[in-house]
Amino acid sequence: MESGAVLLESKSSPFNLLHEMHELRLLGHLCDVTVSVEYQGVRKDFMAHKAVLAATSKFFKEVFLNEKSVDGTRTNVYLNEVQVADFASFLEFVYTAKVQVEEDRVQRMLEVAEKLKCLDLSETCFQLKKQMLESVLLELQNFSESQEVEVSSGSQVSAAPAPRASVATDGPHPSGLTDSLDYPGERASNGMSSDLPPKKSKDKLDKKKEVVKPPYPKIRRASGRLAGRKVFVEIPKKKYTRRLREQQKTAEGDVGDYRCPQDQSPDRVGTEMEQVSKNEGCQAGAELEELSKKAGPEEEEEEEEEDEEGEKKKSNFKCSICEKAFLYEKSFLKHSKHRHGVATEVVYRCDTCGQTFANRCNLKSHQRHVHSSERHFPCELCGKKFKRKKDVKRHVLQVHEGGGERHRCGQCGKGLSSKTALRLHERTHTGDRPYGCTECGARFSQPSALKTHMRIHTGEKPFVCDECGARFTQNHMLIYHKRCHTGERPFMCETCGKSFASKEYLKHHNRIHTGSKPFKCEVCFRTFAQRNSLYQHIKVHTGERPYCCDQCGKQFTQLNALQRHRRIHTGERPFMCNACGRTFTDKSTLRRHTSIHDKNTPWKSFLVIVDGSPKNDDGHKTEQPDEEYVSSKLSDKLLSFAENGHFHNLAAVQDTVPTMQENSSADTACKADDSVVSQDTLLATTISELSELTPQTDSMPTQLHSLSNME
């Protein structure tokens, strides 16, 4: 005998299943997907289960089914258009079938449900919004009904209940909202006794004109607008009560023109009452008047202040034909076009750059973001500030999240973060430079480069150093300059370990090790490692010598050469050898001189800067040797030369005396025994050197005198 099949069904199993899955998610157990939600710089990661998300959201189902799964790896999903709090509520609803949110977030949750294609959450939000809207409409009904009851009780009109068919002229009513409502005003108008005297009927009709119409038409229109899911219904604010009250008085004045003749039938009176009831201004005014009665004295004072401010604002837009004032420009333009047939053409132009826009909103946005340097939106990860929120979003996506989708260059394959960056990069291949300077004709591929270039002509230097007040045209130049004060050298050469203040200096230095000389002279085909060296070399071919000495008129191609030359006239010798005490006008001469003492020791170990003890190249102050020791040492050497008559053993004299002053050395002179120099020239050179050393010793006059006697 076969046994019948039975159904085993648990009503608590679905609830228990959701509860257990929720507990597993909170503990992070068995989670196989991480959802990263980022909105306006705020980011948070949520761990969840693929099966739960795919079962409740078609969006996640499509993502998980289309991905290429790899065993043992967790899937990462990025959402950029959902707020963190909203997605957290979405997850709670998915795992518990319920979530508690604020009333103003219901619309946002509905949008999240539509984006993620979660039908259960979408239906729940829609039903809740429907209930909220019905409650608002019910409150409006109660206001109207209570007012009509008060008015009808004061009119003292005997009326019988009217059948429902008498109000069928207004059309069908929304189901569930007004079917069960019965308005006293309607019964009074349609159920009026026919045996009343004509005069009494007219008096009662005048009283009935003050009664507002039943809110059937307004509720019908409201319900039609509420058919969409993204419609908000709000009770009118109390600050507009006075303005609409004036509209009500105007509407009542129009209604007062309707007078019922004495011989008019009651049916005719009822028809006219229906026409009176169609005046929407009366109903709106009555409802708002009821609301205004509940407002306190403080709110009335605020109303008056706001109305006064509104009257002041109205003067901004005034029609020149009918002298009517408007609060908004859009209303003024619409009035001029439809009432007077004047199509006013308004041009929204930026006063700074002259660019035109379609509307005032776009113009204000342009002025706020383009011509303003204020940056109110910081990145929470690195602190960098931006002018707009969407700039923060793009920055986080490109910099902190790996750049997202990369736009590849078709020629070199370089990946760019955006289409704009790709378009600017492609100009490096095409050579396109659409932005030209109106002053000198120089052209640039980017508008920012042109803006920076124009500062050369205008003299603008907006970036100022806080330490010394130096000004620069670009921000990165100021950053490099500040490292002179701090001593920071963050860029180190991996080959020799030398550090530099900027990446550009390190780039030039690396060419020493690589031997790269990318800059080539088109005249003699000589190559250089730095562009500036090429510019200086070109002056050899052109004959240009822009730097001129103001004392002797000699010209130079480089500024540092002129500075070294000026020391000949001033007698300045700031660089001294600490081994022999000899001074020099430039470091290069000292470097060659130090090879006499020790070729294996670095030449900087001999360097002593005697003029004001500035910092040397290593950033440390160098101690000066004792002045008396240096003076006595030099004096002894010079006297020994004078007494022994070894002037003929000095180094060969060059073409000019100043050159000999820099290069002559007593130690090297002893090796040049074969050099034959005239006695007069050598004596003049020695006297010149001694005259320059006079400030360093008090015994120089005696030495000069002895030398003169020897001559």
UniProtKB/Swiss-Prot annotation:
Induction, as annotated: By GDNF.
InterPro entries xref list: BTB/POZ_dom (IPR000210), SKP1/BTB/POZ_sf (IPR011333), Znf_C2H2_sf (IPR036236), Znf_C2H2_type (IPR013087)
Comp. bias (Basic and acidic residues): 197-212, 243-252, 265-277
Keywords from the named record: Cytoplasm, Disease variant, DNA-binding, Dwarfism, Metal-binding, Nucleus, Phosphoprotein, Repeat, Repressor, Transcription, Transcription regulation, Zinc, Zinc-finger
SUPFAM superfamilies xref list: beta-beta-alpha zinc fingers (SSF57667), POZ domain (SSF54695)
Region (Disordered), start-end ranges: 153-220, 243-312
Protein name: GDNF-inducible zinc finger protein 1
Residue stretches of biased makeup (Low complexity): 153-168
Result, substituting residue 50 to D: Decreased repression activity
Organism: Homo sapiens
Recorded disease: Joint laxity, short stature, and myopia: An autosomal recessive disease characterized by generalized joint laxity, joint dislocation, pectus carinatum, short stature, and severe myopia with retinal detachment.
Gene Ontology MF terms in the entry: DNA-binding transcription factor activity, RNA polymerase II-specific; DNA-binding transcription repressor activity, RNA polymerase II-specific; RNA polymerase II cis-regulatory region sequence-specific DNA binding; sequence-specific DNA binding; zinc ion binding
Residue ranges covered by zinc fingers (C2H2-type): 317-340, 348-371, 377-400, 407-429, 435-457, 463-485, 491-513, 519-541, 547-569, 575-597
One of the record's GO cellular component terms: nucleoplasm
Assembly information from the UniProt record: Interacts with NCL.
Annotated Acidic residues bias: 298-309
Tissue: Expressed in adult brain, heart, skeletal muscle, kidney and liver. Also detected in fetal brain and kidney, and at lower levels in fetal lung and liver.
Post-translational modification Phosphoserine, affected residues: 613
Domain annotation BTB: ranges: 31-103
Effect of residue 97 to V: Found in a renal cell carcinoma sample; somatic mutation
Function statement: Transcriptional repressor that binds the GZF1 responsive element (GRE) (consensus: 5'-TGCGCN[TG][CA]TATA-3'). May be regulating VSX2/HOX10 expression.
